[in-house]
Amino acid sequence: MSLRIVHYNDPVLRRKGEKITAFDKALSQLAKEMLATMQEAAGIGLAAQQIGRPVQLCVVDLRRAEIDFTWELDGAKPPLDLIMPMIITNPEITPDRETDVYLVEEGCLSFPKIRGDVPRPDAITVRYQDEHGTPHTLHCDGLLARCIQHEVDHLNGVLFIDRMEKKTRAAIDADVKTLAKITRAAAKLNPA
């Protein structure tokens, strides 16, 4: 079942997610529906806020990515197909001390057709729980690190446009304002 992805200017995108405490069938079902929604939208990550649920849950799947990245999960390097798709709850990110910050173009399913360069640390460690509540430590870099940082920002009410340099944000500002107007108009037509 595909869920509706909320677009920019929906207030839920600015809400910090509540910590997940119940690792039950309802959580597994929500994660499954989020994965289906993300895949249908041709995305590589999706946060719960993007489907209107302000909780600390996101999903990531980079199996089809054509950009290199490295990972180590709980001290091992399992094949990518064994760790993807990832269901991440209650994440905490620590950028590596010696990592570089790179400016790379990002998009977002809540900002259709809007893209811009975003500075992010290249390598991170993320501590999280999976859908069963099992704790994990993931060290990663490249696209995987960028994707997780983008989704975890959503979980904290931070959007990729907030991280852009002023020049980049100014270049897309008209498109962002247009999207905000469309979202407001749609909310008036279909109040929750």
Curated annotation (Swiss-Prot):
Which cysteines does the record link by disulfide bonds?
none
Q: What SUPFAM superfamilies does the database record attribute to this sequence? A: Peptide deformylase
Q: Which InterPro entries match?
A: Peptide_deformylase, Peptide_deformylase_sf
Question: Catalyzes what?
Answer: N-terminal N-formyl-L-methionyl-[peptide] + H2O = N-terminal L-methionyl-[peptide] + formate
Q: Which parts of the sequence bind Fe cation?
A: 108, 150, 154
**Keyword Protein biosynthesis belongs to the record:** yes
Q: Record's superkingdom?
A: Bacteria
Gene Ontology biological-process annotations? co-translational protein modification; translation
Cofactor(s) in the UniProt record = Fe(2+)
Give any GO molecular function from the UniProt entry. metal ion binding
Q: Where is the active site?
A: 151
Record's family?
A: Belongs to the polypeptide deformylase family.
The UniProt function text for this chain reads: Removes the formyl group from the N-terminal Met of newly synthesized proteins. Requires at least a dipeptide for an efficient rate of reaction. N-terminal L-methionine is a prerequisite for activity but the enzyme has broad specificity at other positions.
PANTHER family, per database record: PEPTIDE DEFORMYLASE
Protein's UniProt name: Peptide deformylase
Give the taxonomic lineage as stored in the record.
Bacteria, Pseudomonadati, Verrucomicrobiota, Opitutia, Opitutales
